[in-house]
Amino acid sequence: MEFDKLMVVAHPDDESIFGGGALLKEEGWFVLSVTNGSNPIRREEFARVMDSVKAEHEIWDFEDKWNGDFDRVKLKKDLRLLLEMKEWKKIVTHGLQGEYGHTQHIALSEVMHEIVGDNLFVFSFSSNDNETLPFELIEGKLSMLSQYKSQYFIIEDFKAILAKE
């Protein structure tokens, strides 16, 4: 399958929590997680989820830190190479507020905003209680997230927003 949409996330599972609906609705995604490439459990969970939604994927090995940043010079260089790989119809990443303030989500968003042109979109959630994803997409996101067994303790915190993408 030809991929023409790019999703760049800080951590494996971010794509499912914040962008799972898009991955389920549209084909042709390439998903990059910039952290946890040397963690065999996280790498395998990510690959399994990406295979389940038929997304091309890659996982890099920048350090995963709660109150951390990235080596932005190296990250920009590596991301530019990926961006130049093809003409992307849509590029999606974290919002500048980092969804819930995660410093690495914010840092990645800042880098992406610096190097991506007009077709950059960020994860967002409806604040209207009546606006939710269709039930089948919520089920799909839950199925995706159920593969991240190492992250159950974190995913539990996001139940309230899973339907609001």
Regions found by a protein language model. Name each.
Residues 1-8, 69-165:
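Metal-dependent de-N-acetylase/amidase catalytic core
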Residues 1-87, 113-117:
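Active-site rim/loop-helix segments in enzyme catalytic domains that contact anionic ligands
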